[in-house]
């Protein structure tokens, strides 16, 4: 005889009125898109009404037109900034997550190394950005390094918190089962810490764009930060806002990629 609970679940699954995954996704983005469209419409209407000149605040149609007209130029510089963001973020993740585990596992390191890391984190990154230009020039590496430094600390702290949060009784159980250190790390410690790690990665994803743009402000021959400075020099407000739209698109896309990676690596937390 079929279990009533299974029958109920099957009925719910086959219910034609149950919302599909696409419908849920569409509903999730419908309201933000509607709010954004309403904001742009109000902006387009209010700026001419208030007689604000274009060199102060352009209407959305002006900078979207500029975004289309100069799409080749803006795309070229956007890809450069995106490359800096991705490389700096990945470097921070590759270094900070294992380091967080090592610091938590070796208590003397937590007492000796972590305070030094905190000290260097307190140094404003924008203050040392000119030094990177002097030391490493105007190429890609200074921007990637600055992005790395901004992403490193949030990911490290989140990783340490996640590795430290594992119940000691779970570790006793793994030892009693004869699991090796590598098996415990791969099958127990990392999955248990992933929630914390991704919290840090999401914060770092926001800081990554800031690091790349600040690095380009200080010294660069390409990138959205360079275009922003060029637009500011000539009071080219449509170009400035077009660059901001492109930068926002990169940030949103990168944030969604991190969310997608979280869903891929943590399917048990996927919302139904």
Describe these PLM feature segments.
Residues 1-35, 256-272:
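Transmembrane alpha-helical segments of polytopic membrane transport and secretion proteins
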Residues 145-149, 182-215, 242, 246-247, ...:
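Transmembrane alpha-helices
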Residues 16-25, 48-93:
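Periplasmic/extracellular loop-to-transmembrane helix junction in inner-membrane transport proteins
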Residues 117-154, 161-162:
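Generic hydrophobic transmembrane alpha-helix motif, especially the helices
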Residues 134-135, 163, 210-247, 266-272:
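Glycine-rich helix-loop "coupling/hinge" segments at transmembrane-helix boundaries
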Residues 155-203, 224, 228:
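Short cytoplasmic-facing helical segments at TM-TM junctions of multi-pass membrane proteins
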Residues 107, 195, 241-272:
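C-terminal transmembrane helix and the adjacent membrane-cytosol boundary/short C-terminal tail
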Residues 88-117:
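Transmembrane-helix boundary motif in ABC transporter permease subunits
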